[in-house]
Design a protein with these regions (language model features):
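Intrinsically disordered, low-complexity linkers and terminal regions
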Residues: 1-97
C-alpha cells in the first residue's frame, strides 16, 4: 500500500522521500505478498532454501525487503534441526542520501 503525504511517499508504514525508492519498495511489497502466499511455513527446510535464494540473488533493495528477510531469518533460527550456519545473514543495502 502506498500513499503520498506532502513530499514523502508512505509504503507499508515507511516514509520514502525518494520516489524511485518508494516505487521499488511498492514492487517489493507486492512481491512479498506473492511469495508469502506461496511459502509454506510448516516446511522450514523449504523456507530456508527460498530465503537463501532470495539473499543470494539480492532480490530486495529497500527496507521493506530487508524487513521481510529479517522476519524469515528470525523464524528460521528458531528451528532447532536447521543448521544455523546455513542461514545467510540479511544483507543491508547502503543507500545514497
Amino acid at each position: 500500500m502506498a500513499e503520498k503525504n506532502n513530499e514523502t511517499i508512505i509504503v507499508n508504514g515507511f516514509a520514502f522521500s525518494d520516489e524511485t525508492e518508494a516505487q521499488q519498495a511498492k514492487k517489493e511489497q507486492e512481491g512479498i505478498a506473492y511469495i508469502s502466499g506461496k511459502l509454506d511455513m510448516n516446511h522450514p527446510q523449504m523456507v530456508l532454501e527460498i530465503y537463501n535464494k532470495m539473499v543470494e540473488e539480492a532480490l530486495f533493495e529497500t527496507i521493506i525487503g530487508e524487513m521481510y528477510l529479517k522476519e524469515l531469518r528470525d523464524y528460521l533460527v528458531t528451528i532447532p534441526y536447521l543448521n544455523q550456519e546455513e542461514i545467510l545473514p540479511v544483507p543491508v543495502i547502503h543507500r545514497q542520501a
